[in-house]
Regions:
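Divalent metal-coordination and catalytic microenvironments
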Residues: 8, 28, 44, 49, ...
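Core catalytic region of metal-dependent phosphoesterases/phosphodiesterases
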Residues: 2, 9, 13-117, 176-178
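Conserved beta-sheet core of the metallophosphoesterase superfamily
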Residues: 163-228
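Active-site environment of divalent metal-dependent phosphoester hydrolases
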Residues: 10-14, 52-55, 82-94, 118, ...
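Short, conserved loop/helix-junction motifs that constitute active-site signature segments
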Residues: 73-76, 142-145, 174-179, 259-260
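Conserved catalytic scaffold of divalent metal-dependent phosphoesterases
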Residues: 65, 88-175
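Structural motif
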Residues: 3, 43, 123-124, 150, ...
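Accessory, non-catalytic peripheral segments of nucleic-acid enzymes
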Residues: 222-353
């Protein structure tokens, strides 16, 4: 039996921005559901954070969620299971009130706010929602008692990659899940593997942190117990490097920007010797109708040829802030202050300016 795994879909991201809804629809209309139909897959497990806002939902976003996902699931006779994530609940200490129960309790959808073991074919799988104070004891006991060797959940595990270049230092220990042959989880938006823990990542780019990070969904085969990654080719964030030194006009002005419509674009100017060419270059880029264009001048002449060079030349924002907190003179717990800073930073990433 093959099961489609998808997680962290975050409907309503960036203040319910319409261009993100359009971008998400392309993925579901052209990639996700056609793949399931072509491969005769009729079961989906969503590993949490189906919506973005914790306390309410925009009606336009709700209609989009129904039209692009839930109605198609119903029309195609797909068996949908949703694990409750931290963005699906308004309170930090309980999953009792959650988006799936309040919005879709009349739909034929199975959702899990407490740890459960469900048989998919002949394979028992432990489904683990977001763990908080109210369900912690039940979650731990269920993991001990379950006969399942596979666990799917929405977990915060220390020692795993939170985003590229940043390891999560908080949450449960990797060893807490050692009894399972395979653990697949949502919550962190970048794909990673730590021992038997597989973070699946979100299906599309939501912030600049996702730039050039592989996005998509997975297929789990209950017979082989293997995960297959299906990549989403659509991108929301793009970078263009401008350098007219020693170039002909045609080299600069014949670039193809047709794929940039509805996306965010950063133009990194390394050498700008001909202002007229640059103006023409920018005019052509604007005609492609991107959502936002940001120009970044490489005024330090760092000769940064690609994005890996840029990353290697600078510390990330969280590291800089953590070092600042570490060097502060304060009576407040620096660990608690650092945790608060990281939480606020992650929240800010998803706010539309």
């Amino acid at each position: 039996m093959k099961i489609a795994l998808i997680t962290d879909t975050h409907w309503g991201v960036r203040n319910d921005a319409h261009h993100f809804l359009d971008y998400m629809a392309k993925f579901y209309d052209n990639i996700f559901f056609p793949y399931l139909e072509d491969n005769r897959i009729d079961t989906i497990i969503h590993l949490g954070d189906i919506v973005d806002r914790r306390k309410y939902i925009n009606f336009v976003t709700l209609r989009h969620l129904k039209d692009t996902f839930l109605n198609k699931v119903t029309d195609k006779g797909i068996d949908l299971h949703v694990i409750i994530g931290n963005h699906d609940v308004p309170y930090k200490n309980t999953n009792e009130i959650n988006s799936m129960q309040e919005l879709f309790d009349k739909h034929d959808v199975s959702y899990y706010s407490e740890a459960s073991t469900v048989n998919f074919g002949d394979t028992p799988i432990c489904l683990m929602p977001w763990i908080n104070n109210s369900n912690y004891a039940q979650a731990i006991q269920h993991m001990k008692d379950t006969p399942a060797q596979i666990l799917f959940g929405h977990l915060e595990i220390a020692g795993c990659l939170m985003m590229r270049g940043q390891i999560n230092e908080h949450g449960m220990d990797v060893g807490d899940f050692s009894k399972f042959d395979l653990v697949a989880s949502g919550h962190f938006h970048t794909k990673s593997v730590t021992k038997n823990i597989h973070y699946l990542g979100c299906p599309y780019e939501l912030t600049w942190s996702d730039y050039q990070d592989p996005k998509g969904f997975h297929i789990f085969d209950t017979d082989t117990r293997e995960l297959e990654f299906v990549r989403n080719p659509y991108r929301m964030f793009n970078k263009v490097f401008y350098d007219d030194s020693g170039k002909e006009a045609s080299d600069i002005l014949e670039k193809d920007f047709s794929g940039f419509e509805g996306s965010y674009v950063k133009v990194v100017t390394q050498n700008k010797e001909n202002p007229y060419w640059f103006d023409q270059f920018m005019d052509k880029l604007y005609q492609a109708n991107p959502v936002n264009i940001q120009i970044v001048d490489d005024h330090l002449n760092l000769n940064l040829e690609d994005d890996s060079d840029i990353v290697n030349e600078a510390e990330d924002t969280v590291t800089i802030l953590s070092k600042y907190i570490e060097n502060m003179e304060t009576n407040v717990s620096k660990k608690r202050l650092d945790n608060l800073m990281r939480s606020l930073y992650n929240e800010a990433l998803y706010m539309e300016v």
